[in-house]
C-alpha cells in the first residue's frame, strides 16, 4: 500500500511538472518587493504577529536571476514577549567584484530549548515537572513541563565580504567580523514559576559556570569558498564549499574564554528532467581547535553567510529538522542534509515568476567533540550532595553513548523569481530521544 501511494505521488508530481506552461520567464529589472505578514500562535507564548519584507534590486536585468543587492527586514513579536528584530543586506554591486553581507538582529526567546550536553549522553524525559521543596527534589508527571526550556536574549551583528581570486570567478577568499551578546536565564513564562529546569540543574552542578550565563563574543573570520551554483537562493546544479577559521578573543568580558573554531560546509546539487528535479545534499562539521569555549558561545555555527534566521546548532529549522532544538550540542559536531527538490508547477502572477515545489528530506547529525563529558557523568552525584533526591532519576547523564540523530520530513516551497523562498517544513525524529512529535517550521529560504 505504501509503495502504491509513493508511486502515485511521483506520477502526479511528474505529470504536474510536464504540464507546466511554456511561457517565457519575465526578466526582472530595477526594484522588486516581497512583503509578507508574520502570523502564528504558541500556547505558552501567545499570538505572534509582525511583518517581513524582501527588497531586491536587479539593475538592468542583465544578471537576472542574480541581483545587485537584496535587503530583508523582519519585525515580529508574541503577545507574551518573545520577539524577533532583524535586518540583513546582501550586496553584490556596491564594490567591484565584492559580495558584502551585513546582518543585525535582536532575539528574545522566552522558551528556548535546552536538552543538555553531548547529544544522547543527556537525558530526554517528556512531560516531567521538577520542583524543589526546601532542600529536596520531587517530580510531578501531571504538570505541564518546563524542564527543557530557558530564556535567551541575543544581540547579533555580522559583516562578511568575499572576493574572487584573480582570473578565477569560482574561487573566493573571504573575511568576516562578528559580535554576539548572549544572556541566559530561567524560563520566563507565566505558569511555570515554581519549576526547576534542566538549565538550573546544570547551573547547580556547575556544568554551566557562573560567568557563562551571559557574555560577549567577538569573532574574526577568514575563509575560502568555491561556488559553481547556477542560482544562489534556488540552485538546480553546482557545488558550494565553504571553509572558515574563526578566532574569538575575549576582548570585552575578561573571563579568559579565548578560542578558535574550524567550520567546513560542502553542498552539491544535481538536476535532472530539465531542472524539474534536483537532488541536493550538504555535509557540515565544526570543531573547537584551540582554547576554551564558554557555554553561551557553544551553540553557534560559525559560517560567513547566513541562509536562515538563526545559526544555532544542532537541532531545529536551520540544521536538523525534526530533532529537538539545540538537542545535539557539543564542542564539535557534524551533520548531513539530503533533499529531493521537486518543482511541481511554475506560473506567473502580478508580473512575478513563481514556482511551487516539494522537497522530501533526510537530516542526520551527531556530536564529534564532547563538552565537559567527565563533569556531566559526575554531576548528579554533585547534586545529591546538595539536595535530597531520593526516588528521583539522574536527569543529567543517561549513561548512553552518543550516536547518529536522524529525522525524516517533507517541505513545501513557494519561490518568487528564484530568490524569495517561502518555506513550510514538517519533520519527525526517528528516535524518541530526539522528540516524539511532528515538528512544523515556517520561514524563509532553503536551509542550504
Give a label for each model feature:
Residues 51-73, 221-265, 409-415, 420-426:
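Surface-exposed extracellular loop regions of Gram-negative outer-membrane beta-barrel proteins
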Residues 220-223, 231-352, 368-370, 394:
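C-terminal outer-membrane beta-barrel translocator/porin domains of Gram-negative envelope proteins
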Residues 25-33, 41-216, 314, 318, ...:
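Gram-negative/organellar outer-membrane beta-barrel architecture
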Residues 33, 49-51, 83-87, 153-159, ...:
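Hydrophobic, lipid-facing positions within transmembrane beta-strands of outer-membrane proteins
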Residues 20-32, 59-68, 94-100, 166-172, ...:
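Short loop/turn motifs that connect adjacent beta-strands in outer-membrane beta-barrel proteins
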Residues 56-60, 74-80, 107-111, 180-184, ...:
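Sequence/structural signature of outer-membrane beta-barrel proteins
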Residues 54-56, 90-92, 160-164, 223-227, ...:
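Transmembrane beta-barrel domains of outer membrane proteins
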Residues 33-35, 69-73, 99-104, 171-175, ...:
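Transmembrane beta-strands of outer-membrane beta-barrel proteins
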